[in-house]
Amino acid sequence: MAKEATRVRRRERKNISSGVAHVNSTFNNTMITITDAQGNAIAWSSAGAKGFKGSRKSTPFAAQIAAEDCAKKAQEHGMKSLEVEVCGPGSGRESALRALQAAGFMITSIRDVTPIPHNGCRPRKKRRV
Protein backbone atom coordinates (compact mmCIF):
# COMPACT_ATOMS: atom_id res chain seq x y z
CA MET A 1 0.00 0.00 0.00
CA ALA A 2 1.55 3.27 -1.16
CA LYS A 3 1.86 6.11 1.28
CA GLU A 4 -0.08 9.21 0.31
CA ALA A 5 2.18 12.08 -0.69
CA THR A 6 1.96 15.03 1.68
CA ARG A 7 1.09 18.23 -0.10
CA VAL A 8 2.82 21.45 0.86
CA ARG A 9 0.10 24.01 1.38
CA ARG A 10 1.12 27.51 0.32
CA ARG A 11 -0.25 30.19 2.61
CA GLU A 12 -2.61 32.58 0.90
CA ARG A 13 -1.90 36.29 0.74
CA LYS A 14 -3.72 38.01 3.58
CA ASN A 15 -3.81 41.69 2.44
CA ILE A 16 -3.33 43.31 5.85
CA SER A 17 -2.17 46.93 5.70
CA SER A 18 -1.15 47.54 9.32
CA GLY A 19 0.11 45.36 12.14
CA VAL A 20 2.23 45.06 15.27
CA ALA A 21 5.89 44.06 15.33
CA HIS A 22 6.89 42.34 18.57
CA VAL A 23 10.68 42.51 19.06
CA ASN A 24 11.78 40.22 21.91
CA SER A 25 15.46 40.76 22.56
CA THR A 26 17.05 38.54 25.20
CA PHE A 27 20.70 38.23 26.17
CA ASN A 28 21.00 35.14 23.95
CA ASN A 29 18.74 35.74 20.94
CA THR A 30 16.42 38.22 19.20
CA MET A 31 12.97 37.14 18.02
CA ILE A 32 10.73 39.26 15.79
CA THR A 33 7.05 38.44 15.25
CA ILE A 34 4.76 40.56 13.08
CA THR A 35 1.07 40.14 13.88
CA ASP A 36 -2.21 41.70 12.80
CA ALA A 37 -4.20 43.93 15.17
CA GLN A 38 -5.83 40.89 16.83
CA GLY A 39 -2.47 39.22 17.55
CA ASN A 40 -2.52 36.52 14.86
CA ALA A 41 1.02 35.91 13.60
CA ILE A 42 1.68 36.96 10.00
CA ALA A 43 5.46 36.48 9.90
CA TRP A 44 8.21 35.62 12.35
CA SER A 45 11.97 35.25 12.38
CA SER A 46 14.83 35.02 14.84
CA ALA A 47 18.60 35.23 14.82
CA GLY A 48 18.81 31.48 15.43
CA ALA A 49 16.40 30.73 12.59
CA LYS A 50 18.62 32.72 10.22
CA GLY A 51 21.57 30.42 10.91
CA PHE A 52 23.42 32.25 13.67
CA LYS A 53 24.64 29.93 16.40
CA GLY A 54 25.94 30.43 19.92
CA SER A 55 27.09 33.88 20.96
CA ARG A 56 26.62 35.30 17.45
CA LYS A 57 22.84 35.09 17.93
CA SER A 58 22.98 37.87 20.50
CA THR A 59 24.69 40.42 18.21
CA PRO A 60 22.94 43.48 16.75
CA PHE A 61 23.85 42.31 13.24
CA ALA A 62 21.99 39.02 13.74
CA ALA A 63 18.94 40.97 14.95
CA GLN A 64 19.14 43.17 11.85
CA ILE A 65 19.21 40.16 9.49
CA ALA A 66 16.27 38.55 11.32
CA ALA A 67 14.24 41.77 11.17
CA GLU A 68 14.91 42.18 7.43
CA ASP A 69 13.75 38.60 6.81
CA CYS A 70 10.60 39.07 8.88
CA ALA A 71 9.84 42.37 7.13
CA LYS A 72 10.14 40.75 3.71
CA LYS A 73 7.69 38.00 4.71
CA ALA A 74 5.19 40.54 6.08
CA GLN A 75 5.39 42.74 2.98
CA GLU A 76 4.36 39.73 0.88
CA HIS A 77 1.04 39.91 2.75
CA GLY A 78 0.64 43.60 1.86
CA MET A 79 1.70 45.13 5.17
CA LYS A 80 2.74 48.79 5.06
CA SER A 81 2.60 50.30 8.55
CA LEU A 82 3.67 48.92 11.92
CA GLU A 83 3.42 49.60 15.61
CA VAL A 84 6.56 48.28 17.31
CA GLU A 85 6.59 46.70 20.78
CA VAL A 86 10.11 46.17 22.12
CA CYS A 87 10.64 43.76 25.01
CA GLY A 88 13.77 42.62 26.80
CA PRO A 89 17.27 43.83 27.71
CA GLY A 90 19.24 42.47 24.73
CA SER A 91 21.57 44.21 22.31
CA GLY A 92 19.38 43.67 19.24
CA ARG A 93 16.58 46.08 20.14
CA GLU A 94 17.65 49.20 18.26
CA SER A 95 19.16 47.44 15.25
CA ALA A 96 15.99 45.39 14.69
CA LEU A 97 13.94 48.58 14.89
CA ARG A 98 16.23 50.33 12.41
CA ALA A 99 16.05 47.37 10.03
CA LEU A 100 12.24 47.41 10.09
CA GLN A 101 12.29 51.12 9.29
CA ALA A 102 14.82 50.65 6.47
CA ALA A 103 12.67 47.87 4.98
CA GLY A 104 10.07 50.48 4.07
CA PHE A 105 7.53 50.22 6.86
CA MET A 106 5.87 53.34 8.22
CA ILE A 107 6.35 53.01 11.97
CA THR A 108 3.45 54.65 13.79
CA SER A 109 4.47 54.02 17.40
CA ILE A 110 7.25 52.46 19.45
CA ARG A 111 6.46 50.99 22.88
CA ASP A 112 8.78 49.42 25.42
CA VAL A 113 6.84 46.59 27.06
CA THR A 114 9.72 45.11 29.06
CA PRO A 115 8.26 43.73 32.31
CA ILE A 116 9.68 45.54 35.33
CA PRO A 117 9.17 43.82 38.69
CA HIS A 118 7.98 45.68 41.78
CA ASN A 119 10.72 43.85 43.71
CA GLY A 120 9.63 40.36 42.70
CA CYS A 121 11.95 37.42 42.12
CA ARG A 122 15.61 37.63 42.99
CA PRO A 123 17.64 38.45 39.84
CA ARG A 124 20.50 36.28 38.68
CA LYS A 125 23.99 37.23 39.77
CA LYS A 126 25.99 39.80 37.79
CA ARG A 127 28.65 38.37 35.48
CA ARG A 128 32.29 38.96 36.35
CA VAL A 129 34.35 38.74 33.18
UniProtKB/Swiss-Prot annotation:
Q: Does the keyword Ribosomal protein apply?
A: yes
Q: Which InterPro entries match?
A: Ribosomal_uS11, Ribosomal_uS11_bac-type, Ribosomal_uS11_CS, Ribosomal_uS11_sf
SUPFAM superfamilies referenced in this protein's UniProt entry, alphabetically? Translational machinery components (SSF53137)
Gene Ontology terms for molecular function: rRNA binding; structural constituent of ribosome
Gene Ontology biological-process annotations: translation
Q: What are the alphabetically sorted keywords of the record?
A: Ribonucleoprotein, Ribosomal protein, RNA-binding, rRNA-binding
Q: Name one GO cellular component term.
A: ribosome
Pfam families in alphabetical order: Ribosomal_S11
Query: What is its quaternary makeup?
Result: Part of the 30S ribosomal subunit. Interacts with proteins S7 and S18. Binds to IF-3.
Name the job this protein performs: Located on the platform of the 30S subunit, it bridges several disparate RNA helices of the 16S rRNA. Forms part of the Shine-Dalgarno cleft in the 70S ribosome.
State the similarity comment: Belongs to the universal ribosomal protein uS11 family.
The name this protein carries in UniProt is Small ribosomal subunit protein uS11
**Species per Swiss-Prot/TrEMBL record:** Allorhizobium ampelinum (strain ATCC BAA-846 / DSM 112012 / S4) (Agrobacterium vitis (strain S4))
Its lineage opens with: Bacteria, Pseudomonadati, Pseudomonadota, Alphaproteobacteria, Hyphomicrobiales
